[in-house]
């Protein structure tokens, strides 16, 4: 039989969670799922259970997943190396085929299966389903040559997200699991950064929270210390001095755009921590870095 102290600890945990369950009841929580949380078996199982729990207590989780390591692995199997410019994957036609196969097939269906096995009702989608994520080819400004732009292939810039398909799934209590693949007017597939899809989708759905799962404790300063809170102004300073770079760039851009366009809060959390999702949503202290506007 559990000791009185162990019982009290469990009661305190539930009591701490209760106000957050009330506050976020029937609210949309957009979660970008990526990093080690998608690779390590214990973390995968824990994530699926946590998502199902959020749904069971009345929240509406929407999952957007990445898959960079898995894509890199598949590219190496066919003799290709991944190339990145300003945090974006250069995507030629052959790479796009592999991206679509890995994201829309292998990874998406694995996540759906995990959630369903733990008692949820998940449905896997890409942005091509119902053409709900419209995109065009993205060009990146060349930092070394003023006024010039870099074509990085079939990398998409989001033009429009139609929320009606997600809303329909929500009315039937399904959990959407979305691979970040968009479609152009001509039917061409586009690889879109999952962080950017998550942010734009959070805006479109008027989400209460946007949560970005990473392989770091959050945003770190140059000494490796966690920055628990950031405003838009402070982020600009960190961009300027090079503290924020590489793969963190699209995450921060996504977070800033989201909070500027109506999302209540954005959190960058460590997906390597078991139950990080619940710790962020259902506890007083939360985890990771909170991004908010200047107001």
Curated annotation (Swiss-Prot):
UniProt keyword annotation of Phosphoprotein present: no
| Keyword ATP-binding appears in the UniProt entry | yes
What are the alphabetically sorted keywords of the record? Answer: Amino-acid biosynthesis, Arginine biosynthesis, ATP-binding, Cytoplasm, Kinase, Nucleotide-binding, Transferase
Q: Where does substrate bind?
A: 67-68, 89, 191
Q: What is its EC number?
A: 2.7.2.8
Query: What is the top-level taxon of the source organism?
Result: Bacteria
- The UniProt entry's coiled-coil ranges are none
Q: What are the BP-aspect GO terms? A: arginine biosynthetic process via ornithine; L-arginine biosynthetic process
Query: SUPFAM superfamilies this protein is in?
Result: Carbamate kinase-like
Enzyme class per UniProt: transferase
Give me the reactions it catalyses.
Answer: N-acetyl-L-glutamate + ATP = N-acetyl-L-glutamyl 5-phosphate + ADP
Which GO molecular function annotations are given, in alphabetical order?
A: acetylglutamate kinase activity; ATP binding
Q: What Gene Ontology cellular component terms go with this record? A: cytoplasm
Site: Transition state stabilizer. Where?
32, 251
Localization (cell) = Cytoplasm
Q: Cite a single Pfam family from the UniProt record.
A: AA_kinase
Its pathway is: Amino-acid biosynthesis; L-arginine biosynthesis; N(2)-acetyl-L-ornithine from L-glutamate: step 2/4
Q: Describe its function.
A: Catalyzes the ATP-dependent phosphorylation of N-acetyl-L-glutamate.
Q: Which NCBIfam families match?
A: argB
The UniProt similarity line reads: Belongs to the acetylglutamate kinase family. ArgB subfamily.
| Record protein name field | Acetylglutamate kinase
Q: Which organism is it from?
A: Nitrosomonas europaea (strain ATCC 19718 / CIP 103999 / KCTC 2705 / NBRC 14298)
Give the taxonomic lineage as stored in the record: Bacteria, Pseudomonadati, Pseudomonadota, Betaproteobacteria, Nitrosomonadales
